[in-house]
């Protein structure tokens, strides 16, 4: 195997696919990141180019590898109370309008391994008193969802 550098054309293919699959827009500045994250997959399959890997994941026969590529190319940056101003806004402008006795529900999209939905849960527990509430967390990455389910 003699893997070549990620060409602009190949990068464009991954950019388009990731945008269509996940709504994630990759700037040109992310080209090295894409190459670095996918290089081990080229080695794993003995492929010589990122274009060959793109064909492999897009041919419909390797949906498991398609998910691996998606997991590798999503950021998964997470920590508790990651965007403090969002939580301030929730406390100051949303929670005061919650209907007492009616379940207050929030969805944490792109919740990674769970820190964001847990942060929401702590905020709701503190701010809603006896009003019932629920938080749903989801993510496009099966790898981080498995981590969240395991409690890590």
List each model region and its residues.
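Conserved AdoMet
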Residues: 1-107
């Amino acid at each position: 195997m003699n893997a070549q550098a990620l060409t602009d054309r190949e990068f464009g293919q991954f950019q388009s696919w990731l945008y269509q699959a996940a709504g994630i827009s990759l700037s040109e500045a992310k080209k090295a990141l894409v190459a670095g994250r996918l290089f081990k997959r080229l080695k794993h399959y003995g492929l010589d180019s990122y274009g060959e890997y793109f064909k492999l994941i897009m041919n419909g026969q390797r949906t498991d590898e398609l998910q691996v590529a998606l997991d590798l190319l999503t950021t998964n940056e997470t920590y508790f109370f990651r965007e403090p101003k969002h939580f301030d806004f929730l406390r100051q402008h949303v929670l005061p309008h919650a209907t007492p006795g009616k379940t207050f529900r929030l969805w944490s999209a792109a919740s990674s391994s769970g820190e964001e939905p847990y942060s929401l849960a702590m905020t709701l527990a503190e701010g809603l008193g006896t009003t019932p509430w629920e938080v749903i967390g989801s993510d496009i990455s099966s790898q981080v969802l498995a981590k969240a389910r395991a409690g890590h």
